[in-house]
């Protein structure tokens, strides 16, 4: 170029790159990597969900501590588990410890997934409700352990026959314990159920005769104990009434509960054939457990021997 030539202006790039060199976009590569990571994680989660983990639970590990759960604050069931842990489990070659958990669903999920070895929280019909509501849970009742104290409570009367016409009576609001309450009232001679009805699935609609025209109110465990002063009677678990400060003298009828309502040692199905779980079941079947239930004041009137 000569000194007299006028420089030809350089045309700006079509897209202003502010002086930086424009390179090919990396966005497709980044998206591809993200998709790959998501697929790998999803596959791993699915593999774990179908039992693909190499990690062993305490249920299948020799010498591990086997946790037996019930609800936090349940002193009677805790006392039973701690008795088994101290006095019975060593005879069966295992180590057992108590674990308190928040509620039924949390307990049963922990059993199903092997976070705890077992629970003594429930009877078979309650377990059936849980499994119906949570079809992914894999649990089963391994052996009956005790019967819960269960009775007819009243602030106003001392015998079921004293209940007046149109008496207000409460049953529990969950299906299994509603059925247990109706069985109980039939035993007391206050109602009869329709012929052929499955008594363990009965509801108030299955009542055939009700001579006193009892008026039923369905309440949950805590609400029922609070409502007792406003009721003529209520059918419920002794432990809830004692915990609420209601005297055992208010329990006016208390026959032994049927086998269907025995408290069960519930285990995770996946581990039922492991040595640890077999030994745990044997520990809860040990005769010393029934002797404890007969004699220990911490479980009196609450957990009854079979």
What are these regions (language model features)?
Residues 142-191, 290:
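A conserved helix-loop-strand patch within extracytoplasmic ligand-binding domains
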Residues 149-160, 261-276:
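A bilobed periplasmic-binding-protein/Venus flytrap-type ligand-binding module shared by bacterial periplasmic
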Residues 129-142, 157, 230, 235, ...:
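Ligand-binding "clamshell"
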